[in-house]
């Protein structure tokens, strides 16, 4: 078993000429821009009872749902529509932490992304209204 020398040499060239650092700077700026777009859109359209946590690092937003809502149920509804969010039980077993959704913001904004976010918002709104 051997390594492809051409690919290995190209990688050495890429890394040794600081192209990687430039790529990372560009990527970080893009991810930050995408995250801000997601944040502002969700902030504008989610029910006021929901909180959005914007942490300075990473490309995820956390949406805190009302305590009555179960993030697993919302996840299951959305996954049936091919929309992926991460419910908090994937990250915590504490009962007090079961009402959060993690949203991946690493995607460039387009009509498909907006339609998916609109469906996330609609699903949360329906659950909030049903819980009142």
Regions found by a protein language model. Give the residues of each.
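PLP-dependent class I/II
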Residues: 1-132
